[in-house]
Amino acid sequence: MPLSSDCALLVIDAQNGFMPGGGLPVAQGDAIVPVINRMAPLFENAVLTQDWHPASHVSFAANHPGRQPFDVIELPYGPQVLWPTHCVQGTPDAALHPQLHVPQAQLILRKGCRPQVDSYSAFTEADRTTTTGLAAWLHARGIRHLYLCGLATDYCVAWSALDARAAGFAVTVVEDACRAIDLNGSLARAWADMNAAGVQRASSQGLLAD
């Protein structure tokens, strides 16, 4: 049964760059695509996000001589994990997965566009002061409850879920429609933070059975 019109599906970074063979592959990342496609028709409203980095982006290890991917450096806004080069603007790596099918999506939000600031969350950049405008866009359309899925659970999904709660939305993470990087315990920490913030968990099977 379709969910009410005050619900929206938020698909986080279902891009080639996070799939097997991509610049920053998440294990089994491609397994989420058919799950998202099956549950997408439950939603009248949907938003997709897209990591969209310039080649000079501060989060790329390649832009820091002597550093390796997954090193952590200090930036003016705090600790920054250095990543393999991924999702560079206009490249196939940055494209949405070709089999992703969410035709009712009303917005594609591109994030991580500024060279000197990373952006995991769909709502607020990593400096924690620059907002993307998504919360206001959703509030203006009467959205009250967000269902999150995508990549990766412990980074962009979790940061988006926490910021959505802070912005006043009910939030449910659809677990089987996500996969994690799990860097040094990051998945357990992310779930602890999300649980503390009141983020709910669900499965796509549960949603489809309701």
Show where each model-derived region lies.
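Active-site flanking residues adjacent to catalytic metal/cofactor-binding acidic residues
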Residues: 12, 50, 175
